[in-house]
């Protein structure tokens, strides 16, 4: 993978000049000048997904120049490097192969001279056997009762991905009740334990090293709670499984290592739902649906790795994002799913994007002088319309938005879905085209009112429009289409990281806070005043000690 400063490319200089030409052009003008704009700036994927990027401040020339940027930064070479198992995560000397986990073609993928696919398939088969025993009721707890509840204990990628997917795929779930615990705040595990029965609960402890502070603190609390009822430590093996590679620590915890499901260093945490970390997904929706999830992602992987840039959906969305982030100065992107099952989708890609591309050091080890990853946020529609859309419509900040919705709902109650989708379509139209002063005044005339008498109100009802959006319309949210959608965003993030010359797959930014917390923790064990930090941190710790006494 080549290390190329994007701002030093001729394409970047051309884009800067092009921005000067485009910055005052409106989306309304672009549509007025091209009756075929939708056809030119939209694409479908497998007749399952329509991506409409026509309501953006772009022209064919814009996309051509952005594609030149992708060529000059050798995006094609980087894609080939990732899919072929090269160690593109150089700061950790690791390959990046979440694509291998969903490689349904089963073509060999070589890391360090070894095909990883036999091990991937073996873990999948092991998860299949285990999950079928749990779901069927064949697996019994220590009192002979079948499992009714599953508690996934993990944090970050070991929590956000499985939680998001099990929520999105609720229409496919079986009889097992899923719970997710991540926060080291004891309230999280305490509230979940109130809901479950130790005789019928299975705990999944998701930690590659089996040393993650938050996860192991919660796991030991769950174990202590369980043993208060079960008594004998041998019963732990019937109620705990591990998603880990540390067989020694897993065995010491009391888990049978036969129920330890491995994954590999080339699986990044925020890309791990496709691995053994996805066991909670399998237990929720069944193995066949998990395979469909993998298959959808694999289909998008093939699209991403083989489709020319001008028709490649992850690349197109990534380039449009760079256009706003690096030329228009937009600092955030909103992900707005019009489907309640997707209520954790934005939170998932908040981690996916911000932990991946929130870097200020480039691949050469130098501080960048350009913007890297955007701030990602969002909530389901229509809730967001009654919360933060005001700022998107009439605020002073540009917020490019992705609107996502299924054409077919899993819950066809009355006309709910038509009302939901009417809002989905209306919002992107309103953001793009706005409402002029003339229209506001005419609306008053149509109501029999004199606009002159309401001059004090008219300016506040004007919408400038020209707010950019992408619309992603799915035929229906299924395991397959969800897999494709997740992979679409994963590859968008990768593409932006390549072009911006940063390492997308490490996360050193999470380390300093953890190191300092480990230093502070022993200082909280007594009531002595602390003076070893700055005055602010000392003051906070000492007030905490005074109040807890």
From Swiss-Prot:
GO terms for molecular function, please? carbohydrate derivative binding; glucose-6-phosphate isomerase activity; monosaccharide binding
Q: Which organism is it from?
A: Salmonella paratyphi A (strain AKU_12601)
PROSITE patterns assigned to the protein according to its UniProt record, in alphabetical order: P_GLUCOSE_ISOMERASE_1, P_GLUCOSE_ISOMERASE_2, P_GLUCOSE_ISOMERASE_3
Q: Gene Ontology terms, cellular component aspect?
A: cytosol
Where, subcellularly, is it found? Cytoplasm
Q: What class of enzyme is it?
A: isomerase
The record's listing under NCBIfam families reads: PRK00179.1 (NF001211)
One GO BP annotation is:
glucose 6-phosphate metabolic process
Looking at the keywords, is Isomerase present? Answer: yes
Q: Which HAMAP family match?
A: G6P_isomerase
Quote the catalytic residue positions.
355, 386, 514
One Pfam family this sequence matches: PGI
Q: Which domain of life is it from?
A: Bacteria
Protein name, UniProt field: Glucose-6-phosphate isomerase
> What Enzyme Commission number(s) does the record list for this chain?
5.3.1.9
Q: Which UniProt keywords apply?
A: Cytoplasm, Gluconeogenesis, Glycolysis, Isomerase
């Amino acid at each position: 993978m080549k290390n190329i400063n994007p701002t030093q490319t001729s394409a970047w200089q051309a884009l800067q000049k092009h921005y000067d030409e485009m910055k005052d052009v409106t989306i309304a003008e672009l549509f007025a000048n091209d009756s075929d704009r939708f056809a030119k700036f939209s694409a479908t994927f497998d007749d399952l997904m329509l991506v409409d990027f026509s309501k953006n401040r772009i022209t064919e020339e814009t996309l051509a120049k952005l594609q030149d940027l992708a060529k000059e930064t050798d995006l094609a070479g980087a894609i080939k490097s990732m899919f072929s198992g090269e160690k593109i995560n150089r700061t950790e000397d690791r390959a990046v192969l979440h694509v291998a986990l969903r490689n349904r073609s089963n073509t060999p993928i070589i890391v360090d001279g070894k095909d990883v696919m036999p091990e991937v398939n073996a873990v999948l088969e092991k998860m299949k056997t285990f999950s079928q025993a749990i779901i069927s009721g064949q697996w019994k707890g220590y009192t002979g009762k079948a499992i009714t509840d599953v508690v996934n204990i993990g944090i970050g990628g070991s929590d956000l991905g499985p939680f998001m997917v099990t929520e999105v795929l609720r229409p496919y779930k079986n009889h097992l009740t899923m719970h997710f615990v991540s926060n080291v705040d004891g309230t999280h595990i305490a509230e979940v334990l109130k809901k479950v029965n130790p005789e019928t609960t299975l705990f999944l402890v998701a930690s590659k090293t089996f040393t993650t502070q938050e996860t192991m603190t919660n796991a030991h609390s769950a174990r202590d709670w369980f043993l208060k009822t079960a008594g004998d430590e041998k019963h732990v093996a019937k109620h705990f499984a591990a998603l880990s590679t540390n067989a020694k620590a897993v065995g010491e915890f009391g888990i049978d290592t036969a129920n330890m499901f491995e994954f590999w260093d080339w699986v990044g945490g925020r890309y791990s739902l496709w691995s053994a970390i996805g066991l909670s997904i399998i237990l929720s929706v069944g193995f066949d649906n998990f395979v469909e999830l993998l298959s959808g992602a694999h289909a998008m992987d093939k699209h991403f790795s083989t489709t020319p840039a001008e028709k490649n959906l992850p690349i197109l969305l990534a380039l449009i994002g760079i256009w706003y982030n690096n030329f228009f100065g937009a600092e955030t992107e909103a992900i707005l799913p019009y489907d309640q099952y997707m209520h954790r989708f934005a939170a998932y890609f908040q981690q996916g994007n911000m932990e991946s591309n929130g870097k200020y050091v480039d691949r050469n080890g130098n501080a960048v002088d350009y913007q890297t990853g955007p701030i990602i946020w969002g909530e389901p529609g229509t809730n967001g319309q009654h919360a933060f859309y005001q700022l998107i419509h009439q605020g002073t900040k540009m917020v490019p938005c992705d609107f996502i919705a299924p054409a077919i709902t899993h819950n066809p109650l009355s006309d709910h879905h038509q009302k939901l989708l009417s809002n989905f379509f209306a919002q992107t139209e309103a953001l793009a085209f706005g409402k002029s002063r003339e229209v506001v005044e005419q609306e008053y005339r149509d109501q029999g009112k004199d606009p002159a008498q309401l001059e004090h109100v008219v300016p506040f009802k004007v919408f400038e429009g020209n707010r950019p959006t992408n619309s992603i319309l799915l035929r229906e949210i299924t395991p397959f289409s969800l897999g494709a959608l997740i992979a679409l965003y994963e590859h968008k993030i990768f593409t932006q990281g390549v072009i911006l010359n940063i390492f997308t797959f490490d996360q050193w930014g999470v380390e300093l806070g953890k190191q300092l917390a480990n230093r502070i923790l022993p200082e909280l064990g007594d009531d002595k005043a602390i003076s070893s930090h700055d005055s602010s941190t000392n003051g906070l710790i000492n007030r905490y000690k005074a109040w807890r006494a």
